[in-house]
């Protein structure tokens, strides 16, 4: 009996990063984030070698979409790593965090800052 060879269909993964909150507060630049991702994504060990497997685009509704098709290897952890590097480079890592909303959907949101009412009362 001949071995059965299965042909893997080319899977398409889509990662969506919602950057609406920081963009609305003029803290985050969506275009520079997309440019950073394009320049720093590694494919086959080469930085910036996206080819036809990976496309990174910015949508008008404050979302960045990373589409991986074919044999492109890309994970959510790698996207999180690159985003954290971008935030650290632009010195906004202390205020914004990268949060997973659903599978392959992420969001940049501000850290929750609890206002200390007790300190305000003590000062009065």
Swiss-Prot record:
The region annotated as signal peptide is none
Gene Ontology CC annotation, any one? ribosome
InterPro entries for this protein: Ribosomal_eL22 (IPR002671), Ribosomal_eL22_sf (IPR038526)
Chief subcellular location equals cytoplasm
Residue pairs linked by disulfide bridges in the UniProt entry: none
GO MF terms, alphabetically ordered: RNA binding; structural constituent of ribosome
Q: Does the entry feature the keyword Ion transport, yes or no?
A: no
For this UniProt record, the keywords arranged alphabetically read as follows: Cytoplasm, Ribonucleoprotein, Ribosomal protein
Q: Which domain of life is it from?
A: Eukaryota
Q: Where in the cell is it found?
A: Cytoplasm
- Gene Ontology biological process: cytoplasmic translation
Entry function: Component of the ribosome, a large ribonucleoprotein complex responsible for the synthesis of proteins in the cell. The small ribosomal subunit (SSU) binds messenger RNAs (mRNAs) and translates the encoded message by selecting cognate aminoacyl-transfer RNA (tRNA) molecules. The large subunit (LSU) contains the ribosomal catalytic site termed the peptidyl transferase center (PTC), which catalyzes the formation of peptide bonds, thereby polymerizing the amino acids delivered by tRNAs into a polypeptide chain.
The entry's family comment says:
Belongs to the eukaryotic ribosomal protein eL22 family.
Q: PANTHER family recorded for this chain?
A: 60S RIBOSOMAL PROTEIN L22, LARGE RIBOSOMAL SUBUNIT PROTEIN EL22A-RELATED
Q: Subunit structure of this entry?
A: Component of the large ribosomal subunit. Mature ribosomes consist of a small (40S) and a large (60S) subunit. The 40S subunit contains about 32 different proteins and 1 molecule of RNA (18S). The 60S subunit contains 45 different proteins and 3 molecules of RNA (25S, 5.8S and 5S).
Instruction: Please state what the protein is called.
Output: Large ribosomal subunit protein eL22
- Give the organism, scientific name: Candida albicans (strain SC5314 / ATCC MYA-2876) (Yeast)
């Amino acid at each position: 009996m001949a071995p059965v060879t299965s042909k893997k269909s080319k899977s398409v993964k889509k990662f969506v990063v919602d950057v609406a909150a920081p963009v609305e507060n003029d803290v985050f630049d969506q275009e520079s984030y997309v440019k950073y991702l394009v320049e720093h994504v590694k494919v086959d060990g080469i930085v910036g070698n996206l080819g036809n497997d990976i496309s990174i685009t910015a949508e008008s509704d404050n979302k960045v979409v990373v589409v991986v098709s074919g044999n492109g290897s890309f994970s959510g952890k790698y996207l999180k790593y690159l985003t954290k590097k971008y935030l650290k480079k632009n010195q906004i890592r202390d205020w914004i965090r990268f949060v997973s909303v659903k599978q392959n959907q992420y969001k940049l949101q501000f850290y929750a800052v609890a206002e200390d009412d007790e300190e305000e009362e003590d000062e009065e």
